[in-house]
C-alpha cells in the first residue's frame, strides 16, 4: 500500500520493501485551464513546459562536481548518468495526459558510492520570457514506484500555493547505512532555468 506523505516527511524505502533495488520516480502536474471571453468559449490549457530533473549530491549535500553543473544533473539535455544508474525517461513538453508527466529511473544498487543524495526538482522552461509560474499549475505530485513490481511506494502531493514561483524541489533519495530514504521537500524558487536551481547546491 502506498504511503501519502506531507512536507518534510521521510521514510526508509529499503525497510518498506525488502530487496528494493530499482525505483521509478514519477513527477506529474496539470495545467490550469484558461477560459475564453466571458467564459463562453471552450476552455483551453495553458501551454506550459515543465521540466523534471535530478541533482546529484555528495554526503554533505553539495554537488558532486563543483566545476560542472551539467555533470551533476540528469535532465532533458543529459538523459543518463554514465553507467545508466540514473536515467531521465524523456521530456514532456505540455504536461498533457494522466499519470506521470516525466519519470526518472534509479538503479539504487548501481548508484556510484560518491553520490549521497539525489534531489528531484521541476522548473518551468523559459518561465520569465513566457510570464509563467507554478500558480498556473495544479495537481502537482512526486511519487516513488518499485520498478520491478510496478507498485507505488509513496506519494507527495505538492498542494501549496506556488504563485510567482518558477521552480520546485519536490523531494529526494538519501543514502543511509540501511539503504535509501525518501524525503519530501516542497521548497519553491524564482529561478530562470535549471542552472539556477542546481547552483543552490554549490559550496
Protein language model regions, located:
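Intrinsic-disorder/low-complexity signal
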Residues: 1-203
